[in-house]
């Protein structure tokens, strides 16, 4: 939806995306401490991490630039150039989201993991499902040409901060829960690991965040 004529402040959308991407990168930096030993120093990981960070930078620049010009950054097919840019940004969004899939697989396949099995499974599944569900919902929205379902009958304002529609369907809601599966599912797994009596002595070590800054995708991209 174009920012022109929108009741939301024109900078709310860039702000939401910047906050979401910051949380996303911070979560991956935390989970990097549970990757197989040595993987963060491999050549493929460094190149891949750099590509992910550049994709995120491109998304932020495009969304902020579109807001400053007063044009829609999403679902904008008003000209060939804008349509091409929108599809390119969609491809970059898949690339940056794929890092959740890569992390999930690596954590699940880590034979030397010290995580509680229940928590390890929840972290891996949360990351994998973040990619699968986010791409599925985003792809459906892209093919539908928008995120609204149905027609507003009351013109009620959107939900505070998030802007979700309150009088008809809004696919941004499932998109939110899809992108945050990497947080919700591990949280349940952590509680489950603590609740199981025979697992209490091996509760998930949440303090095992990356001890070296080289584990962070953002750090690697700067090298």
Residue ranges and their predicted role:
Residues 1-7, 25-48, 106-121, 141-145, ...:
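Juxtamembrane membrane-water interface segments of multi-pass membrane proteins
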Residues 1-2, 12-34, 48-68, 88-103, ...:
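Hydrophobic cores of alpha-helical transmembrane segments in multi-pass integral membrane proteins
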Residues 5-15, 75-88, 117-121:
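Non-cytosolic membrane-interface motifs at loop->transmembrane helix junctions
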Residues 36-39, 66-78:
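Helix-loop junctions on the outward
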Residues 98-135, 139-156:
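Long hydrophobic alpha-helical segments that form multi-pass transmembrane helix bundles
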Residues 140-182:
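Membrane-interfacial catalytic/cofactor-binding modules of polytopic membrane enzymes
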